[in-house]
Amino acid sequence: RSSAASDVYKRQKSHFAAYGTGYDFLHFYAVEESGKKLGIISVFNASMMISTFKDKRFDDKVLGELAGFILMNKPAAVEFEAEYSDKLAELTKAEYKGDKRTEFSFVAKNDIPPLDVNELPKLDDVFRILAPCFPAIKNSYELWLTDTSHRVRRGLSQSFLLGNYTTATIQYIIDGVALVGHVGTIPEERGKFHARQLLYWIGEKLTQDGFQVRLFARPHRVSYYEEIGFKACGIDLVLERIENE
C-alpha cells in the first residue's frame, strides 16, 4: 500500500476501534468480486472511505460498481486510494468534483521548543477556537463534542491548546501513526505564527513519543508546511458532492 492508501485504511480502523458496528451513523461494507474480498467501504456520518486489502486491486468492473454505490448513497465526501482517482472522478463527475490534497510527513530535528502547550484541554475551549475556522464544526457542536470526547477517552485522538488562541487535534492515533486534523487560531491572533509553532511542537513531541506524524493539506499550502518541517509524500483526490443550487 502507498502511504495515502494506508491512511484511508487506518482511519477506517480507527472508526472501528472507536465504535465497532453497533451505531447507526457508522456502516461497513465488504467489496467483493467472484467471492473474493477485495476491500472495505466505511460510511461515517456523511463521509465515505474506500480501501483495498493488502495485495488486492479494483478492476474497471469493480470501480464501476463502486461509482454506482457512491451515486446511490450520495455521501458528502469520498476518500480512496490515489491510484483510482482519475477513474472514480470520471465515473462520478455528474454529482462530484475532485479536490486534490497533499499528504505530508513530519521530519523531526529532535528539538522540542519550550512552548506552554496544554495536552489535556477542555474540549469546549478547543471548540471555541475551531468554530470560527470551520463552519461544519460550528454548526454541529454536539456531534463534534460527542465524537471527539469518545475518541480521546479511548486513546484514539488528542487535542492540544497553545495559550487560549491556537489549537490542533490529532484525528487518529493508530498503528504508530498520528494524523493531525483540525488546526485553528482565533481571528485576532492570526498572522503571529502560533499555528506554525504548535504544529512544530506537536511534530517533535509525537515523534519523540514514537509516532509518525502526518497531515493533509491543499497543494497551495505545500511551502507553508515544508517550512515547519513537514515533507510532501503524496497527492490524492477527495470527491466532494456538488451542491445543487
Question: Where do the protein language model's features map onto the residues?
Answer:
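Conserved active-site tyrosine of GNAT-family acetyltransferases
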Residues: 88-92, 224-226, 230
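Acyl-donor-binding surface of acyltransferase catalytic domains
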Residues: 44-116, 235-242
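Conserved acetyl-CoA-binding loop-helix of GNAT-fold acetyltransferases
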Residues: 58-68, 185, 191-205, 227
